[in-house]
């Protein structure tokens, strides 16, 4: 079925992919992205593991109503989370060579 040495090569390739995935996951955890809301008046910096590192609020918003500020902070957090997901997807595509996984299947296995 696999031919001479085919299974060994397959296992070696699987191990190499697993090693690459571990490195990419470390890179993702260290990366930081910034999400914005209100045309940049509120910025949230988030790590690849979805930890919020920094919230930057333009001083002009501190004079406005509290509810609007809360909405902008939530929107900036959501934007940062979306950017993290996009970066994770791009990084994993580099490792998998764009291989499409079945829905619900997560890497690493």
From Swiss-Prot:
Name the Gene Ontology molecular function terms of this record.
Answer: DNA binding
Q: Residue ranges of region Disordered?
A: 88-109
Keywords for this protein:
Cytoplasm, DNA-binding
The Swiss-Prot or TrEMBL record describes its family as follows: Belongs to the YbaB/EbfC family.
Q: Does the keyword Cytoplasm apply?
A: yes
What's this chain's function? Binds to DNA and alters its conformation. May be involved in regulation of gene expression, nucleoid organization and DNA protection.
Under Pfam families, the record lists:
YbaB_DNA_bd (PF02575)
Report the protein name in the record. Nucleoid-associated protein swp_1717
Annotated Gene Ontology cellular components are: bacterial nucleoid; cytosol
| Family matches, as NCBIfam families | DNA_YbaB_EbfC
Which organism was this protein described from? Answer: Shewanella piezotolerans (strain WP3 / JCM 13877)
Give its localization. Cytoplasm, Nucleoid
**Assembly description:** Homodimer.
Coiled coil stretches, renumbered: none
């Amino acid at each position: 079925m696999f031919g001479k040495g085919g299974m060994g090569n397959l296992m070696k390739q699987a191990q190499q992919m697993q090693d690459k995935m571990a490195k990419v996951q470390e890179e993702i955890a260290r990366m930081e992205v910034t999400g914005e809301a209100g045309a940049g008046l509120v910025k949230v910096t988030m790590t690849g593991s979805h930890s919020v590192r920094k919230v930057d609020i333009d001083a002009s918003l501190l004079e406005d109503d509290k509810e609007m500020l809360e909405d902008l902070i939530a929107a900036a957090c959501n934007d940062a989370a979306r950017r993290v997901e996009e970066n994770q997807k791009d990084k994993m595509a580099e490792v998998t060579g764009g291989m499409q996984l079945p829905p619900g299947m997560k890497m690493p296995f």
